[in-house]
Amino acid sequence: MTVNLTLQHASEIIGQDNVDLTLAAGASAKVSNLTVASEWLTNNTGYLVTISVNDKSGNVLSSKRAGLSVEDDWTVFPRYGIVAGSPTDQNSILVKNLEAYRKELELMKSMNINSYFFYDAYNEATDPFPEGVDSFVQKWNTWSHTQVDTKAVKELVDQVHKSGAVAMLYNMISADSNPKNPALPLAALAYNFYDSFGKKGEPMTYTIGDNPTQVYYDPANPDWQKYIAGVMKSAMDRMGFDGWQGDTIGDNRVTDYEHRNSTDEADSHMMSDSYASFINAMKDLIGEKYYITINDVNGGNDDKLAKARQDVVYNELWTNGGSVIPGRMQVAYGDLKARIDMVRNKTGKSLIVGAYMEEPGIDYTVPGGKATNGAGKDALAGKPLQADATLLVDATVAAAGGYHMSIAALANANAALNVLQSAYYPTQYLSVAKDTIRKLYNYQQFITAYENLLRGEGVTNSTQAVSTKNASGEILSKDALGVTGDQVWTFAKSGKGFSTVQMINMMGINAGWHNEEGYADNKTPDAQENLTVRLSLAGKTAQEAAKIADQVYVTSPDDWATSSMKKAQASLETDENGQPVLVISVPKLTLWNMLYIKEDTTATPVEPVTNQAGKKVDNTVTSEASSETAKSENTTVNKGSEAPTDTKPSVEAPKLDETTKPAPSVDELVNSAAVPVAIAVSETAHDKKDDNSVSNTDQGTVASDSITTPASEAASTAASTVSSEVSESVTVSSEPSETENSSEASTSESATPTTTAISESHAVVEPVASLTESESQASTSLVSETTSTIVSVAPSEVSESTSEEVILMDYQKTSIVGIDSL
């Protein structure tokens, strides 16, 4: 029996390690020293880690796969999550719910979330955390009178830091929660030029019902800038936050106090005109140490914000916003991509998208509640969130080069994890099924592992023609913009030395992303098989095209592939102009596929590294993609009038070279198209922006620890054997697995992850067994907890000899219990 570890970047195997075992019936063994050496790793790079267990004939007994990101700057590939009040306790953040929050944060950590913003965790906009106050009730919050325990907030911020992530404090950039008694004189307020947020000439005010909730200052007002900078710096210093997630109520044409009654537009300006100067003023007043971003509601102010020193770009997108595509609103998947493309072109950054799914409408003035849309009916009927609706938005945003912020920790008694369905984050009516969480987990692994292909430096839309046909020759890619449904939306991107083709399945469904009608508007597309993708290679020579045809791969986060990158069958044809066309066979499409085409025909393949002498192998994936599910998937792996659409809606309170010998495939190397393995790392202090650290976010399951190590240090240190400070252990047992008869990946509530720890000399992959309560709460110092992964084998399935290596008769009845989770 052998335990194998493989580290892969795109199609290249970077490094491997394995340990051989001899196991007797009914016995268990602990295996150490599966190592990911720091010299294998490059900063701001995503990797796929696969761990598999094989019998002595090479058959896969069980396996897991996860994305690993090595990064010294989370803003390059932001993966944003939410912490907000609990719907179980009047939207409050309470000490008594800390354990529930911790469990959710551990799960989100395993989903590679590297940044969190704490929503509505403040007392009031102009005094977020009063000094000397342990708990406060939000007086402005008239619908639930939310309570916030500052100890709870501090402990959650600490937990975020221990995971190697950053914590952002949410607050409006120009709001005052006391409309009748604002903190600054009336001269500092913004005044409506048109009837919009109140009457013309009156202070810009947000009202819920008949209750004025917030009044707004002009972000350009220097007195306001100095005041709020001092307030926010004090709050972030005392509570340990790393930055400010600034929010806006939407754009509006305003005047200053002196010109509040003027009808001359020259005396007015848009609130968004001052976003950039406000951000830059905050950077100067608060300091570069703190991160800052502003929610540009519905986008469109990219030109204004181009000179802003904001660290990431965040847009909350609504269907009432104007699309980048002329003459449209932002209602379709393609409109989301268009906005992401615009931000990328203007700023060079990957857009964080806030796009809330379904938004169940329920009128609670009616006894028992009355649904006002299909999603509301679903919620009242107790139905969960429609999984594919969420996954399709995740796929669209990621394939376009952005990140969909959707996962939230709410300490919700009705959900192990939450997916945002409303702009008021504690109000999430639809539960999230375990299988949906499992799929979300797999998508997060994919987005992390292939981040350089999806949104790396230089990745842009390709000008090469691309299309998709079915087995009958019917063209399924009917609309390159992605605004029409009932198609396989296909678009190409290019990067340095490669291209990708993104395939989003909309067969049998419409292109609307919001899905407010819930299950009445089915979002599960018709699965496709045996597709053909044609990609123009115009400009390539015949020789170059032939080389490229041998460097085509397919992968998907969906269950048929679970991030496994497989060699695809590809051939060449010529178009009417005699230019080469790459013809690629795609065996299956569920929701989202990505084709990876290596176009660098001169590069020498990376020579893989093995941690065990004599086990060096070729590093290029060469096996053809198969429509069959891999063996391992059969195992259990335990504005004002001028811009009315830029305002937030009212809301409740991705031919062989004959001179080259065919190389073994990844499937041959790890003998599996595995499902995810968790990555976590041991704990170190978090030093905010000055840290310049590698963040190896763990990628696997419900609980783990993390570490940050300076990127320069991690990249330069040599591989070595495992020291006493970081150890890895795999326990192999011949006891039967409790889930041995399961035929597909399943959610295990008790399992804990495999971890990777990067020390000064190396990184260690550490499969972790399910911990007892006391073990799971054990503190860590320099290293991760010493735990183990259990590989279970029923005694009846092993050979009678207790001195020989176990021979497994039924591979579906063996599981890696310790790293089972999702």
Swiss-Prot record:
Keywords attached to this entry: Glycosidase, Hydrolase, Signal
Q: What does the record give as EC number?
A: 3.2.1.11
Annotated region described as Disordered, given as residue ranges: 607-669, 683-788
Q: Which reaction does it catalyse?
A: Endohydrolysis of (1->6)-alpha-D-glucosidic linkages in dextran
Q: Which InterPro entries match?
A: Glyco_hydro_66, Glyco_hydro_b, Glycoside_hydrolase_SF, Ig-like_fold
An example of a GO molecular function for this protein is: dextranase activity
Superkingdom of this entry's organism?
A: Bacteria
> Where are stretches of biased composition, namely Low complexity?
619-636, 706-761
Q: For this UniProt entry, which residues form the secretion signal?
A: 1-38
Listed Polar residues bias regions: 693-705, 771-788
One Pfam entry for this protein is Glyco_hydro_66
Family according to the record: Belongs to the glycosyl hydrolase 66 family.
User: What name goes with this protein?
Assistant: Dextranase
